[in-house]
Amino acid sequence: MKRFLLFVNRRKERADEKAKAIREQLLRLGAQRVDIEDQSTQGITALDYDCVVTLGGDGTLIRAARGLAGSGLPLAGINLGHMGYLTVASKDAEIPRVLDKLILDDFTVEERMMLCGRIVRNGHESPRDREWLALNEIVVSRKSSAGPVHFCIYVNGAFLNEYKADGIIISTP
């Protein structure tokens, strides 16, 4: 891989400093292009980049995955947060090894399923309803003052089941 986008959560401590250091290291290793972005993944395609490296936490990686869904671009997360469950590097000492592997194409892409959820009320989609993309799960819950909600669950347009509950969590396997 030679063309990288660093997608940075600037609210994380030392994020700018880390992004600049990683950019410099990738260029030293032979990267042809390393851009830094912190706002949006809109318009980013596989024509421009070979890989997106997120700097933040799991939330940053999930936000990038949602924005890049369908692009075919691989994501590699560097954890600057607390959990780092989805990231490939959580400690400063791990970052050089990860960058080397990316430059040398010495890695395995783990395909992750994403969910697309939509809420339909009383058989009709209202203008305020939209689709949500999720990497892990979609949580739908009632308003705090309301009673239980009646959920009819469909998967790919086929009825699955119905539930009466305070909320429901639909997750990837």
Describe the residue ranges of each PLM region.
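Catalytic core of DAGKc-family lipid kinases
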Residues: 83-167
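Divalent-cation-assisted or electrostatically stabilized phosphate/pyrophosphate-binding catalytic cores
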Residues: 79
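N-terminal glycine-rich "phosphate-gripper" loop used for MgATP/nucleotide binding
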Residues: 54-58, 66-67
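Short glycine/serine/threonine-rich phosphate/pyrophosphate-binding segments
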Residues: 60-64, 172
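Short glycine-rich anion-binding loops that position phosphate/pyrophosphate groups of nucleotides
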Residues: 58-60, 83
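Short glycine-/acidic-enriched loop or helix-start segments at secondary-structure transitions
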Residues: 16, 63-65, 86-87, 150
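ATP/NTP phosphate-donor binding region
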Residues: 1-51, 55, 91-108, 119-132
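Proline-centered loop/turn at the N-terminus of a beta-strand
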Residues: 72-74
